[in-house]
């Protein structure tokens, strides 16, 4: 199985994402391994990459998928790049369980 594309931190998780904007529909494309060996969650959104629309759609989709408020999902890095890092606020263990159930990866350290 694929490793999880997240790292626990004191107040939540950091989630590594590769985003495809302007897709036919918003959805999950699974977990892939980057050339450097790091796992990354591949997502697509219908919104175009204009004036932050794709990033807003990304955070809203992740929040809805994990049962979080939109304010609990923030973009940490990659504002104009396809590869992004999101901070998910909450209990790291509970978030890890929800995230793993959502995309079907292994837990941290597996």
From Swiss-Prot:
Matches recorded under SUPFAM superfamilies: YggU-like
CC terms in the record's Gene Ontology section: cytoplasm
InterPro entries the UniProt entry points to: DUF167, YggU-like_sf
Pfam families: DUF167
Family: Belongs to the UPF0235 family.
HAMAP family: UPF0235 (MF_00634)
Name of the protein described by the UniProt record: UPF0235 protein Mpop_2087
